[in-house]
């Protein structure tokens, strides 16, 4: 099936095809590290900026113009669909998603009505349509995976322990699976609408899946993520599945159905590749904190990532260069500019231990 930008290095690497250059983009490449972002964002809220299609378009384009990355990712938030259906979510500066009335029981299922993208998130569709007419690189659609979104709804804000989430999971399986099913449908409807509007790839963010044991992930989370990724398979766009601290889950994350598994900085890419079936591609995995430390440590670490990414060794899968999580606010944009130059100037498979020292 022909899809937008199907001949681009990014899409080809996602599909496990060999490329002449390693494609690169950065999670949170549009954001607080960019002075031009801070200038246009002003003092309004993130959700208000997302709802302004012209502003969201400009913010999405900023890192593409500055860095010369090989893909853009829509400026939005994984909680946008839940906010749009009126669940009562805000994005608090320095905190993250905050839920006014957290999910606590079966009655709250009624608050999770189906998403009608044309009516509930028309600004997202307008932003995507704006971008596909202006971009020369693929646009990545994205959504929050059911578990990560559920954790915010249940905990009420970011959590380190996920006590309430795991308690619901283990004490009321019926309610848990109904919640996951509804959140899967929200993600599906959001992703399909972005893809129909012209996005060329899709990333499912299960940021906090690493808080789970393999057994809990397989039983309580994998079915819903598989449902989401399976529902968009027919669109033909490559699918990326990313979580943080998921080394023990790589085989299960790959089993959910994406062409690409995102890897954080904790696991070397060559080790990650041994844990996923061929020809699964990998995305990652430069440590964002090292990038914030300046150029020389970044150069060494980036070359090591390229060496371990391997340029599709033996046809086992492609490599999309990225950070292991989002760009930190204190990152110097000039360092990321140099990372892109380095990645593009190093032929796939050419980095060695000597070049990385």
Give the location of each predicted region.
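Active-site-adjacent beta->alpha loops and helix N-cap segments on the catalytic face
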Residues: 121, 212-225, 265-279
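Conserved, mostly hydrophobic/aromatic
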Residues: 23, 64, 131, 187, ...
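Active-site-proximal, glycine-rich beta->alpha crossover segments in alpha/beta enzymes
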Residues: 90-190
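Catalytic-face loop-and-helix region of soluble metabolic enzyme cores
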Residues: 230, 234-357
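Active-site mouth loops of central-metabolism enzymes
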Residues: 42-56, 162-189, 287-297
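N-terminal basic, low-complexity leaders that serve as flexible interaction/assembly modules and, when applicable
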Residues: 1-93, 227, 311, 333-357
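Structural preference for beta-strand elements that scaffold enzyme active sites
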Residues: 19-21, 25, 71-73, 138-140, ...
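Alpha/beta enzyme core
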Residues: 157-208, 214, 218-231, 235-238, ...
């Amino acid at each position: 099936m022909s899809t937008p930008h199907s001949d681009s290095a990014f899409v080809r690497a996602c599909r496990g095809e060999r490329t002449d250059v390693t494609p690169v983009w950065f999670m949170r490449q549009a954001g607080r590290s960019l002075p031009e972002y801070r200038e246009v964002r002003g003092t309004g809220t993130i959700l208000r900026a997302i709802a302004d299609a012209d502003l969201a378009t400009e913010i999405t384009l900023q890192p593409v113009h500055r860095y010369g990355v090989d893909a853009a990712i829509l400026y939005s938030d994984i909680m946008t669909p839940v906010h749009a259906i009126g669940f009562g979510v805000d994005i608090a500066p320095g905190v993250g998603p905050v839920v006014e009335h957290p999910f606590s029981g079966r009655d709250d299922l009624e608050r999770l009505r189906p998403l009608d993208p044309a009516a509930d998130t028309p600004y997202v569709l307008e932003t995507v349509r704006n971008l596909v007419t202006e971009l020369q690189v693929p646009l990545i659609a994205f959504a929050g995976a059911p578990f990560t979104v559920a954790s915010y709804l249940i905990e009420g804000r970011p959590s380190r322990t996920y006590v309430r989430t795991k308690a619901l999971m283990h004490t009321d399986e019926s309610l848990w699976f109904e919640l996951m099913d509804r959140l899967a449908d929200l993600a599906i409807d959001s992703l399909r609408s972005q893809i129909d509007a012209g996005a060329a790839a899709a990333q499912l963010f299960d940021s906090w899946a690493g808080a789970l044991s393999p057994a809990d992930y397989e039983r309580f989370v994998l079915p819903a993520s598989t449902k989401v990724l399976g529902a968009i398979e027919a669109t033909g766009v490559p699918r990326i599945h990313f979580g943080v601290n998921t080394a023990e889950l790589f085989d299960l994350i790959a089993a959910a159905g994406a062409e690409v598994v995102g890897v954080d900085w904790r696991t070397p890419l060559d080790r990650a590749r041994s844990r996923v079936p061929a020809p699964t591609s990998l995305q990652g995995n430069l440590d964002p904190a090292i990038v914030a430390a300046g150029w020389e440590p970044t150069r060494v670490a980036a070359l090591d990532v390229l060496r371990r990414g391997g340029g599709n060794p033996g046809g086992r899968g492609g490599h999309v260069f990225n950070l292991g999580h989002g760009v930190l606010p204190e990152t110097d944009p000039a360092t990321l500019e140099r990372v892109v130059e380095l990645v593009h100037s190093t032929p796939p498979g050419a980095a060695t231990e000597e070049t990385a020292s």
